Amino acid sequence: MRVLHVITGLGVGGAEQQLRLLLRHLPVTCEVVTLTNPGPVAAGLAADGVRVHHLGMTGNRDLSALPRLVRLVRRGGYDVVHTHLYRACLYGRIAARLAGVRAVVATEHSLGDSQMEGRALGTGVRALYLAGERLGRTTVAVSPTVADRLKRWGVPAPRIEVVPNGIDAARFRFDAERRARTRRELGLPAEAFVVGGVGRLAPGKRFDVLVGALALLPGDVRLLLVGAGPEEGALRVAARRAGVAGRVLFAGERPAVPDGTPGPALPSLLAAMDLFASPSPEEAFGLAAVEALAAGLPVRYVSCPAIEDLPPGAAKGAERVECAPESFARAVTDVRARGALPREPADAAHHYCVTRSAARLMGVYAAAVARPTPAGASSR
């Protein structure tokens, strides 16, 4: 089976890194086309032996990219076209249909209650999404929560399959030596209590709440933020105004899999933390929180479908808190008062094993190739 993955960009992001990890475990021939920004993940895919095509799209309305994508799909002889992220889902589904590929799968990575990839969920966004969705065979939701959102949007339930994001749990297993080495590299005192946050530095992630919480905590508490984005400048200003600039460390974008770039990879950064905090009020999955649980960290979160969809007891060490500085400050104080516990991975780490996700996705591919065009989908 030959599968073409179409994605909007290949910078360091959750969907992009999840794609790279999945491709390492899919027993089919995969190629990837990125509409824009090849980025670090493109280099990682190439290092893994995956052929990556760059379409060179200049913006959302660069319609000249569509015929180029159609030609690429036709030449490739693909059995399945699998699209990821809003723009790629729209262009990829259309291109696949024009190229004669009917087995089209799309993964919905980022649908929230009020936004998708930073876009407000207005009438136009919804209408365009549903128009494109009708050209596909299957829409994959990364969590039952996202599946419910898709149904409320109007996506027919028979066309929705849940394939959770997966992690390589062994990569995140805690290592005391790695913790000490990473703290030395980052200049973090061995005795400091380090609160960590991972994600795009964007307003919706609400990392400002963690900066506010830090100002309410003792001076030996540090905040380690892993990620990059448009909110970084505002967060630095907020830290200066709160008097905690010297206690906040911005680590930048870091890959889950070491890629040869300077600086520690995400598993090492998680090892350096004492508590993982996720103040985002709206998530589609919450992959970073699952990775933190795999690293044996206590997790405090505002929204995390990956945790909330689990059976009781599968995410020991994870607790929900309010999206407020005072709530996170209390959570840090409580966790610290309990003392250091053994850093053992939670059951959630095994529940979201990437090999299980890959096996479920292979089932989706097989069904998409085998079955006729579903009711409600367009046909030529």
Residue ranges and their predicted role:
Residues L63-P67, R102-V105, G112-L135, D148:
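Nucleotide-sugar donor phosphate/pyrophosphate-binding loop at the beta->alpha transition
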Residues V73, E253-R254, T261-P264, S268-M273:
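Short alpha-helical donor nucleotide-sugar binding micro-motif in glycosyltransferases
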Residues G13-L21, F193, G197-L216, P230-R236:
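A conserved mid-protein helix/loop that constitutes part of the nucleotide-sugar donor-binding site
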Residues T145, G166:
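Carbohydrate-associated surface elements
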Residues H5-S64, R149, G229-P230:
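N-terminal strand-loop element at the rim of the active site
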